[in-house]
A protein has these predicted regions:
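Alpha-helical coupling/stalk and coiled-coil linker elements that connect catalytic or binding modules
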Residues: 1-424, 431-437, 443-460, 483-484
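ATPase nucleotide-binding head domains, primarily ABC-like/P-loop NTPase cores
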Residues: 68, 369, 376-593
Length: 593
């Protein structure tokens, strides 16, 4: 069971976190004990002129430095472990439904002119996006939103993503590690801004700045050495120190402006460096992943470039210390060297940085799509039927938004024509349509679908499920539905494959007009290049097949046990012969016995 796997991973991670907490306490106690011993040994040894005590103090100083470094490394690991536990918790949330509390629901990507976004719950609360999203960068989230489309995309890219997701499914622990490293990034981190800053060339003459820095720094260092070790005049090094510091102050505003990006990107650079190192050593050997990860290795290696830039960012950060600024610039013209090196880095690596960040954004998309396979016992990669009449064949299909324990699997054997589904209220008609549409969206994205097998023709999905009026626009619910069906008819004239899903057709008008309008709409939407699924409570629509229209019937039904109404949510062939509206009215206390 997949849930058992993630619970075991969590238990192991919790034990690891407990061990880290224990070692953290030990490091704190050790540092607290060693520091005063170091001070006492050094001060006492200096006062008494004792070489032995000074050596002991030096030993304690070295020991304290080692403890500090080990403590910092442990803190980084603790932070990663906490992020890892958070990611494991997100996976476990997919099994109990608590994932719907996630604030990242993709509501910002909802488009009013794209009904499937709401009808199929692609974006928004309790949506496909909310279930899937493992992205923490803005680019990754944007790419995931673009992938979740009701319109078929480039099948070459879809199949490449399928292959990459297949490989991720074989390495669930790697997926957890990568997601945990991504979770350490700032939420919705805009990598495009970072890429732009890294690629921005330095204005002015790099060679001049570099030459000035090298000449003056060397002159000051050599004059100091001459004065200290050979008894030379101090006038020259003092004059050079003053001149260098004056130069640094004169160019301060420019160096501050040029080096400013390093200040706020230092933390992100370290995180991306660790992410790219994890990707470099990951056992991802498929051709699909090789193509995705190739920018990390050529023309320049991402980990080497980011490592050098991280060192430069640390050097630039030292300038914030006033005393270091005075000494480093007076002797070495530190600012000039930092600015020259940053410009040199931009020329060598800046253009490639944008491609590195795109690699991670695409990896975030793949990690998101893989969540279906990581959390569903029954899943399959869809097969696309690109030739012949449209078809949608599914075995044991369920809706991703329902937990696997509560979802009832159903089959689909749909070809060109219309399927009219009847059944009682709450029997599962709308959920079945959403199941078909949502799995089609997952298929187009390159994700596994919630089914034992799934074959479909790439076809645009048009929906009319959640209809609402528009008071500001003066549009009633009925007219809003008419506009949607009109769009379906307009698109159908292109002759391209379509999957049309209409729930309770023309529910917003009286029964006589509804039946007349529905019959005509179904006639016009029953096409050789379209699969149309319509739910209704009007049994009259079940007779359209007798008029020579390729219409088939299916239904959901209920049964009663005492005063309880029960559903099995299984679709059956043929029309429905029962209703439950009066029973529900009595159950709600609206109608008397």
């Amino acid at each position: 069971m997949k849930k058992d796997f993630y619970e075991n991973v969590r238990e192991h991670a919790l034990a690891h976190a407990h061990t880290q907490d224990t070692w953290r306490t030990r490091f704190i106690l050790a540092r607290t004990a060693v520091f005063p011993l170091m001070l006492v040994a050094l001060v006492h040894g200096y006062d008494r002129g004792s070489v032995e005590e000074l050596m002991l103090g030096g030993f304690f100083l070295l020991l304290f430095a080692v403890l500090v470094l080990r403590h910092r490394r442990l803190e980084r690991r603790r932070i990663f472990t906490q992020a890892y536990l958070g990611v494991v918790g997100e996976y476990l949330a997919r099994f109990d439904g608590s994932w719907k509390k996630s604030p990242v629901d993709g509501a910002a990507y909802l488009r009013e002119k794209c009904p499937p976004d709401r009808d199929l719950h692609i974006f928004g609360a309790a949506s496909l996006y909310q279930y899937l999203c493992a992205a923490h960068t803005r680019m990754g989230r944007d790419r995931l939103a673009a992938a979740l489309s009701a319109t078929p995309q480039d099948l070459t890219r879809t199949r490449r993503r399928q292959a990459a997701v297949t490989e991720l499914l074989a390495h669930p622990l790697l997926a957890l590690e990568l997601e945990a490293r991504g979770a350490l990034l700032p939420d919705a981190h805009d990598t495009r801004v970072l890429a732009k800053e890294l690629a921005q060339p330095l204005k002015g003459s790099l060679k001049l700045i570099s030459c000035i820095g090298i000449v003056l720094a060397n002159a000051c260092v050599w004059s100091l050495c001459w004065a200290i070790f050979f008894g030379g005049s101090w006038a020259i090094p003092i004059a050079l120190f003053t001149f260098n510091l004056t130069m640094a102050m004169a160019f301060f505003s420019r160096t501050q402006r040029e080096l400013a990006p390093l200040g706020h990107m230092a933390s992100a650079l370290r995180l991306y460096g660790r992410i790219f190192r994890a990707l470099e050593r990951a056992p991802l050997r498929s051709a699909a992943f090789h193509a995705i990860l190739s920018p990390l290795f050529a023309p320049v290696r991402a980990t080497i470039g980011l490592s050098r830039l991280t060192i430069l960012a640390d050097c630039a950060a030292m300038r914030r210390n006033f005393f270091f600024f005075i000494l480093a610039n007076g002797i070495l013209l530190w600012d000039f060297h930092c600015m020259a090196y940053f410009s040199h880095w931009r020329k060598g690596y800046g253009a490639a940085a944008a491609d590195w960040l795109k690699v991670w954004a695409e990896t975030e998309v793949l990690l998101s799509l893989a969540r279906v396979g990581h959390t569903r016992e029954v899943h399959a990669f869809p097969r696309f039927a690109e030739e012949g009449a449209p078809q949608l064949m599914a075995e044991d299909a369920t809706l991703l938004l329902l937990t696997e324990e509560t979802a009832t699997p159903n089959d689909a054997q749909l070809t060109a024509g219309t399927l009219v589904i009847t059944g009682s209220n709450m029997s599962g008609k709308t959920t079945y349509m959403r199941c078909l549409g949502a799995n089609a969206v997952l298929a187009y994205a390159g994700a596994p679908v919630c089914a034992r097998s799934f074959t479909l023709t790439p076809m645009a999905v048009y929906t009319s499920i959640q209809i609402s009026d528009d008071l500001a626009g003066g549009i009633s619910t009925f007219y809003a539905e008419l506009l949607r069906i009109k769009k379906m008819m307009v698109y159908s004239k292109r002759g391209k494959p379509m999957l049309i899903l209409i729930d309770e057709i023309f529910r917003g008008t009286n029964s006589a007009d509804r039946i007349v309008g529905a019959r005509e709409a179904i006639r016009r939407l029953t096409l050789p290049h379209a699969i149309t699924v319509v739910t209704t409570h009007d049994f009259e629509l079940c007779d359209l097949g007798r008029e020579g229209i390729p219409v088939t019937n299916a239904h959901f039904e209920e049964h009663y046990e005492g005063d309880k109404i029960l559903f099995d949510f299984k679709m059956r062939a043929g029309r429905c012969h029962t209703t439950n509206a009066q029973y529900l009215l009595r159950m709600a206390g609206i109608m008397g016995e």
